[in-house]
UniProtKB/Swiss-Prot annotation:
The name this protein goes by in its record: NAD-dependent malic enzyme
Catalytic reaction annotation: (S)-malate + NAD(+) = pyruvate + CO2 + NADH; oxaloacetate + H(+) = pyruvate + CO2
Organism encoding this protein: Escherichia coli O1:K1 / APEC
Binding site for NAD(+): R157, D270, N418
Molecular-function annotations in GO: malate dehydrogenase (decarboxylating) (NAD+) activity; metal ion binding; NAD binding; oxaloacetate decarboxylase activity
Length: 565
């Protein structure tokens, strides 16, 4: 259902003059009416002409096009965001296809690497380990009191770029921009946070411009106690907040998720969001091919927390489709840098142990090696689906893709590693190596592939199709937790909007122009499932839909009325 338009009520504010112009959430720039200019002491502080937001957005678009590099475009958009947030979101929504890769992946990776160099203005909260005893005071300093969504990182595993220290702040800022642009969550409700626990990146430690704590990363008990202090302070300040963990290192990501997911409404987008969008993509791709996901054999390259999270969600989905757990697990094969995960492999991480194959079941495989490589696995398993979450470029070689295609006429290949410099294989190569037969979805955006005079659109398996809708659904329903079933409902809803399924052609995922519609549908499904699972108060479907409509923020200026503080 489309949101119902309603007249915005006037907003009563106490700020005036230059202070108002410096307030990004309230600043209208040249769009302040003459009456507002008189009432708020703005006469003479702005050019004479009163503009509409669309006129402002058109000027900003012209200026944007004058920048030649993606990082310069990113800096320009961040400057608008830090001076006039309403205009920023109107501009982004007008040009989402063009600007999403600039405000988030892949350009945000470069922005994180150069964070201290391109720093202009503070946004969000920086919590240094040295300030750990001032945690409550720090959160009290946040100017927006009604925070509903926090994205937090410690900067240790930023995309595929590794430890970026406080430069990782670019990720929470970018993620929350998408919560608003795609999911309609008011920017006044969002807070980006970086936990500055030091950095092991020697280049940053040696950089005179680096703005973070110049110290090796704290670890073990010190680290977990610090994170716990943060969580407890957040719970006290905003007990109903949705907390998203973002780009934590593999060794910490799953332990933190498992520790806090039943203590505070929280999830890890790298693990659960990536899994949800991948499963939604696979459900749609399987249906488009005339089958079910439970019929497919799946090979993963990359057995970290993200890869294993996707695998577990695939197993849950195939069980929903009728497989036993044992049968579901036998169809999923995990390969890391040491080869196929088997029950004979030493030093497995806890979350890997349920995803091993029994070595005794592989005795008839065509291989002489004790270490079973990706090529060995593809040759013997004959998979229908190949998923890359390795963070290493070029590992889907021509030999591997051709071997897969030899046994699978319509292979599904998903090189999901970010940014584009880390992708396991390019869509151009995959299409060519499979004679145009592969269905390709990537983690980073790629242009359509032209092969033998035919155009192949490349779907971006973008978490932005999932997490904004989850956030909106949690806020609208008042959910106290995010359950696995809520994530599964998001995947199923996403698959229902696949153009390839609906029309028999086009992308396997919706176009970005439809992302708000998809987010609202996911929000409804997530909210409904939250009610069914008892983590949200039950209401009628109409009441839930109305709550979604009421919470969906639009990038439009409101009339201001003056009041005293």
């Amino acid at each position: 259902m489309e949101p119902k338009t309603k007249k915005q009520r006037s907003l009563y504010i106490p700020y005036a003059g230059p202070v108002l112009l410096e307030f990004p959430l309230l600043n209208k720039g040249s769009a302040f009416s003459m009456e507002e200019r008189r009432n708020f002491n703005l006469l003479g502080l702005l050019p004479e002409v009163v503009e509409t937001i669309e006129e402002q957005a058109e000027r900003a678009w012209i200026q944007y096009q004058g920048f030649k590099t993606e990082i310069d475009k990113h800096i320009y958009l961040r400057n608008i965001q830090d001076t006039n947030e309403t205009l920023f979101y109107r501009l982004v929504n007008n040009h989402l296809d063009e600007m999403m890769p600039v405000i988030y992946t892949p350009t945000v990776g470069a922005a994180c690497e150069r964070f201290s160099e391109i720093y202009r203005r503070s946004r969000g909260v920086f919590i240094s380990y040295q300030n750990r005893h001032n945690m409550d005071d720090i959160l009290q300093n946040v100017p927006n009191h009604n925070i509903k969504v926090i994205v937090v990182t410690d900067g240790e595993r930023i995309l595929g770029l590794g430890d970026q220290g406080i430069g990782g702040m670019g990720i929470p800022i970018g993620k929350l921009s998408l919560y608003t642009a795609c999911g309609g969550i008011s920017p006044a409700y969002t807070l980006p946070v970086v936990l500055d626990v030091g950095t092991n990146n020697q280049q940053l430690l040696n950089d005179p411009l680096y703005m973070g704590w110049r110290n090796p990363r704290i670890t073990d008990d010190e680290y977990y106690e610090f994170v716990d202090e943060f969580i407890q302070a957040v719970k006290q300040r905003w007990p109903d907040v949705l907390l998203q963990f973002e780009d934590f290192a593999q060794k910490n990501a799953m332990p933190l998720l498992n520790r806090y997911r039943n203590e505070i409404c929280s999830f890890n987008d790298d693990i659960q969001g990536t899994a949800a969008v991948t499963v939604g993509t696979l459900i749609a791709a399987s249906r488009a091919a005339g089958g079910q996901l439970s019929e497919k054999k799946i090979v993963f390259l990359g057995a970290g927390s993200a890869g294993c999270g996707i695998a577990e969600m695939i197993i849950a989905q195939t069980q929903r489709e009728g497989l036993s757990e044992e049968a579901a697990r036998q169809k999923v094969f995990m390969v890391d840098r040491f080869g196929l995960l088997t029950d004979k492999m030493p030093n497995l991480l806890p979350f890997q142990t349920k995803l091993v194959q029994k070595r005794e079941n592989l005795s008839d495989w065509d291989t002489d090696s004790d270490v079973l490589s990706l090529l060995d696995v593809v040759r013997n398993v004959k998979p229908d689906i190949l998923i890359g979450v390795s963070g290493q470029t070029g590992l889907f070689t021509e030999e591997i893709i051709r071997e897969m295609h030899k046994h699978c006429p319509r292979p599904i290949v998903m090189p999901l590693s970010n940014p584009t410099s880390r992708v396991e294989a390019t869509p151009q190569d995959i299409i060519a190596w499979t004679e145009g037969n592969a269905l390709v979805a990537t983690g980073s955006p790629f242009n359509p592939v032209v092969w033998k005079d035919k155009i192949y659109p490349i779907a971006q398996c973008n978490n932005a199709f999932i997490f904004p809708g989850i956030g909106l659904g949690v806020i609208a329903s008042g959910a106290s937790r995010i359950t696995d079933e809520m994530l599964m409902s998001a995947s199923e809803t996403l698959a229902q909007y696949s153009p390839l399924v609906l029309n028999g052609e086009g992308l396997v995922l919706p176009e970005l122009k439809d992302i708000q519609k998809v987010s609202r549908a996911i929000a409804f499904a997530v909210g409904k499932m939250a009610q069914q699972q008892g983590v949200a108060v039950k209401t009628s479907a109409e009441a839930l839909q109305q709550a979604i409509d009421d919470n969906f923020w639009h990038a439009e200026y409101r009339d201001y009325r003056r009041t005293s503080i």
